[in-house]
Amino acid sequence: MEDGDEVVEPIEPESEDIVNLTKRLGVDLVLESNDDWKIQEIGFDGVERYLQPETFTDHVGKLARKVEWTKLVGTKSPYENSKVDPEDELDDENVAKGGLNEELVTPEAGPWSSVAKYLHESLNQLNSLLDVISVTKSTDYMKALTVLDPITVQEPTPETISTNRGTQWIWKRRALQEAVQVLDMAQKQRQRASSNLGLSADYMAHLQRTKFFEELREMREIWRVRKVGDYICGDLSYHIFGWKYDTPAIFDISRRSLSNNMENLSIIEVSVPKDLARRSMLAVSIVQDDIQSGNGLFRDPKDKKYTYSYRESDSEKVKLLHWKDSLKWAQNTLLLRDVFKTICTDAIKLRNRLSIIRDNVLLIHLFDDYLLRFELQWFPFQTGEIKEEGDIYLNRVLREMIIGFECTKFIRPQFFCSMPVTHLPEALDLRGCGGFNTAQIEERAVRSRSILQRMLDVASHRALVTMVSDVAERVSRISLDPTVQYRWLNCGRTTSRMMFNMTSKDFEMYIGTISSVRSVFFANISSDGVEVETKDGIKMKCQRDPARVMYACQYAMCCYSVTMVSTMSRNNNWVTPFQTMCANVFALDERGNPAPNIVLCNQAATRSILFVFHVGMEPEVFVRRFIVNEETMKPEEHEWKKLCYSRLHGATLCRKIDALLVFLRDH
Amino acid sequence: MGVTWVFEAEQTAKSVERLLESIGGDLHGTFIVDVTPFNPPTPSSDYPSNVVMHHSKCPQSTFSICPKDTFKKSPKAVCDRGFDLILSKLSSGLIADNAGKIEIIGNEYSLYKDWMIRVGTATQGTTVKGVVVEIEYDPSIIVIQCKDMMIEFVKSVFNKYHETLPEIFKITEKPESYTALDTMWQYLGIATKLRKKT
């Protein structure tokens, strides 16, 4: 109920009475001028007492009184409706809400039903309008235009024209037409050429051009070529990382005008820088500095053999060379020149080693009397074979080191998250966070060694290896029993290992697994010196002296001989073997030199045999009567009698031992 | 880098140096340790203060410890020297307290190659606060291995300070590695004590 100018009270069809009333056509209208409260009474003093209008609850109460409740609910039903069986409700007539009734009564729509219908419709229309607006606002399906907006046709912008598919097709067609024209022209020319057999000037020029470009392409497979304006130039420098196309190392490329008598020359003419117009070679060798080689170490200043340099008079000859050769030689010259310069600079920095540089020859002290010699040789810039001088192995190693140096990145590349360019090795990256102290930082800061230092190591090792193979050859040649065989176990650039194997022919069956300790020994070679090592781990340092190496090998042979004697005396097929009384591998002779010895005794205990093996000399054999009782012995009866070794029966040591043991078995 | 024991000495640095030279120590060089507290601009209990330290033994490192009640609860970190530069950018949260900075400068002696003893004078600003001795046993980084030997060493050389052990010696029972941060924790404790001293 709303207060307004017109107070309308529609009738609510709640009770039965009201439904049965006749349908009225009009509506009760009560017009009041304002919504003053009704005056109940006016007091004598002029105070008006108002009749308070009904509140909602009052109004509901008034209506509720009009309803005949007993008719609705029924007298029999209990107060609480919830326990009532829903079936019972059907007995009541016209229950207010939700009741099934046989008599279907069309509900009266009421006087405002059409208004409601129109309002509902307009509400629906508004809802759909709202939907449309929201759709247009959030999507691109429709664009809202005001009534006054002119409808413009969008002109195609240059962008849209270019991305338009139609235009692209047009361009493709135009390009294809151009290609067709070119091919047509080519076809015509080819026909003309085939009919003329290619003698027109045009065709010759065309041939030359194609030939030029083909050869240029060949050249570009190996060399860096660049076009600057109208000139084509190439680069002779060999660095992978660093500046390229540096002025001193570029060569010009031009087209040679072919005339008829130069058929075998290439159409590309290159002009190599004049100072690189020679062939070079860097020879490395190990030389000995003694009186005889005095003048041979350096070059004779009057000798012109390796000192070629470019002269203007040679320019014609140079022009006749094929670019493949001349560029290769020129780059090699550049490379070797730079390497020699670097090596000389490094040599000057090495303060502890003496070095002399003169006339493109560098001599640096290796060890003892030996020097390492680097010589840069120049040869004329023409075809022909150049004899390789110096030690071929060292030449190759030097070449490999140069290339390895060029390929090594000393600066770490930048990574995905940009990191600073740094020289420090990766192992030092966490030196701050790891709390490394100074000693640890130094340890991890591995610095690269120069080529010269590495060459020195390799060359000294090579000299020592040559020396040891020499000694091994001598040892194996002179020793008859035991026979010594040697082989390389490990050959490296700065360390190698050689194994010596000793055997006695015809007596191998006596060598069991026990004796393998004595029958094998090794020589370890580093770049500083040689060390002879026995299988049970005893090392004999031989520095760089070949005599000492020989001595060590011979000592090992003596130890082996002792073992042979003891093995043979035990494993004899004779019924009565000999007894080893004592054996000493570390014994010394009167002069203090090592002389392993062994004393045997026969089974009958009548004789003692003493073998003394001196290093590098014939063994000595002594015999005496066996001392039965130390206290009662008479020294003159038990003197050692030396036997003449060379007159013993048998060719080798083992055979002599065999024969001797047989003889002394029972005597 | 070995197990280290840092303590405050009650004698002058010179007397300690003379003592070391008498038992055969060789002067190795100089060292410097500095301890700088960093505080928030307005003192508050929510934001704790941080202490940044450097030690010349680890020249590329910076140590940062936020001291709380116990050793295990204090956040500690080792970083490279760039940390100092970063800290200057964080001046809205942490400001260096240069008045409270303590520097320990002195000499280091090496004894028979295994022991490194550093003796330094601790100064705060211009006032000298005390003398600090650091004993490092290089070969071992396991505390329980060399704890007893170090106590014996201190007893035999100084005869005075061997009773108060550093915290790390007391709390470590298992064979754990000793790190540079443990040394700096000891320095932190000593620096705090020195700051309170007048």
From Swiss-Prot, chain A:
Protein name as it appears in the record: Mediator of RNA polymerase II transcription subunit 17
Gene Ontology CC annotations of this record: core mediator complex; mediator complex
InterPro entries found in the cross-reference section: Mediator_Med17
Alphabetical GO biological process terms: regulation of transcription by RNA polymerase II
Family: Belongs to the Mediator complex subunit 17 family.
UniProt keywords, alphabetically: Activator, Coiled coil, Developmental protein, Nucleus, Transcription, Transcription regulation
One example GO MF annotation: transcription coregulator activity
Subunit-level organization: Component of the Mediator complex.
Role played: Component of the Mediator complex, a coactivator involved in regulated gene transcription of nearly all RNA polymerase II-dependent genes. Mediator functions as a bridge to convey information from gene-specific regulatory proteins to the basal RNA polymerase II transcription machinery. Mediator is recruited to promoters by direct interactions with regulatory proteins and serves as a scaffold for the assembly of a functional preinitiation complex with RNA polymerase II and the general transcription factors.
Residues forming coiled coils: 172-197
Compartments it resides in: Nucleus
From Swiss-Prot, chain B:
Primary location: nucleus
GO cellular-component term (any): mediator complex
Subcellular location: Nucleus
Covalent S-S links between cysteines: none
GO MF annotation, one: transcription coactivator activity
Role according to the record: Component of the Mediator complex, a coactivator involved in the regulated transcription of nearly all RNA polymerase II-dependent genes. Mediator functions as a bridge to convey information from gene-specific regulatory proteins to the basal RNA polymerase II transcription machinery. Mediator is recruited to promoters by direct interactions with regulatory proteins and serves as a scaffold for the assembly of a functional preinitiation complex with RNA polymerase II and the general transcription factors.
Assembly: Component of the Mediator complex.
InterPro entries recorded: Mediator_Med20
Similarity remark: Belongs to the Mediator complex subunit 20 family.
One Gene Ontology biological process: regulation of transcription by RNA polymerase II
Protein name listed in UniProt: Mediator of RNA polymerase II transcription subunit 20
Pfam families for this protein: Med20
Keyword Protein biosynthesis recorded: no
Annotated keywords: Activator, Developmental protein, Nucleus, Transcription, Transcription regulation
